[in-house]
Amino acid sequence: MTETFHCLNDAVVTRGDYARLIDVNIHCEERPVWDVRADGVIVSTPTGSTAYSMAAGGPVVSPETDCFVVTSICPHSLIDRSIVFPSSKALYVKVQNDVDNNSIFTADGKRPVQIDGRTVVRISKSPYVARLIKVKPDNFYEILRKKIIER
């Protein structure tokens, strides 16, 4: 069964109810890139980079940057870094060791979907564009400084 979700901020694959790590495989197009043992992974847009991804240690990305950021959630590793991919590439996320149908996929935190080790989550740039109305002009770097750096 194939379902399509659209999100503005992030797509998350995470462990379910059990307090155990999951093994997640990340592919970019057909190429294996990263295997991580963690509570899960966050794939964020630049808009979502200042939310869950940042809280998990991911970078803050300028909204003009056309990319995805993959950040692991509580990885079982002393050395772990986020990876930035161009949004022109499709990413594939698969939970390797979940046979209990206990992992969860969410897009922007909406309607959690249970997934298992046979499920491959494909993440790609949506053909839809979000059009936002600005009440006043903003400067990303000034807002970043005020909200995050000066806290």
Show where each model-derived region lies.
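AMP-binding/adenylate-forming core of the ANL superfamily
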Residues: 40-44
